[in-house]
From Swiss-Prot:
It is an enzyme of class 3 (hydrolase). This is Proteasome subunit beta. PROSITE patterns: PROTEASOME_BETA_2. It comes from Mycobacterium leprae (strain TN). One of its GO terms (cellular component) is proteasome core complex, beta-subunit complex.
Amino acid sequence: MTRSFPDRLPTNLAFPGISVINQSSFVDLLRRQAPELLPVSLGGGQSGGGQQLSHGTTIVVLKYPGGVVIAGDRRSTQGNMIAGRDVRKVYITDDYTATGIAGIAAVAVEFARLYAVELEHYEKLEGVPLTFAGKVNRLAIMVRSNLTAAMQGLLALPLLAGYDIHAPDPQSAGRIVSFDAAGGWNIEEEGYQSVGSGSIFAKSSIKKLYSQVSDADSALRVAIEALYDAADDDSATGGPDLVRGIYPTAVTIGAEGAAEVTESRIAELAREIIESRSRAYTLGSFGGSEK
């Protein structure tokens, strides 16, 4: 009788002792078969550091009853220069997850796209999607693979937002997972998180406004307002640009799946926030002049 050992790597029967390729992992398969096709940060080549590369920030994530919303600003910087004003930093990666990645812009984009392919590749081969815990582990492995490049300046840190379809309570099925540069991860229990150069200002804003969150729309408003506050204090974070018509991007994820928020809705919320802040500043200035 042959016993199975689930914790042991599968072996090639033709060559005992030689591990087979983990074909359910697209990144692992590509690394073994065609490493030159991988992004530089994941082992596809050598890099000389990230001093002259553009950086993207800031990402915010909030849970609401029945789901989660993730949003990001659009600015990328190169040193003290603005490198781009319409960079996309939030991506839907499968039916129930989305990622927002801050750091080196090129690495962040490749991370998000490769992660989406990784999840799709697994589902096609295995016939079932990964559990949420499995999705977290796959992204953690990718982040850990980038550690050497991160130490050379090519750092990109993701935030994973998702809806756990296996959660016992659908109202609390929204999930937020943060990662460190070594691939360590943490499920956020506070209900919100932020990453990027403006994260400290965004989190401070969310902390004061989070009690207003009751549904997806109110969570979206708080997320946009947090990015507005971050842009007010952090030069690397871009706020809503009414002149150019450039606004943050956002994704909501609930029981019905992940969906991008329309630009028109974000623009409407941005105008409301700016108008309310303008009235507050105007009233404050008049009040301060009285004696």
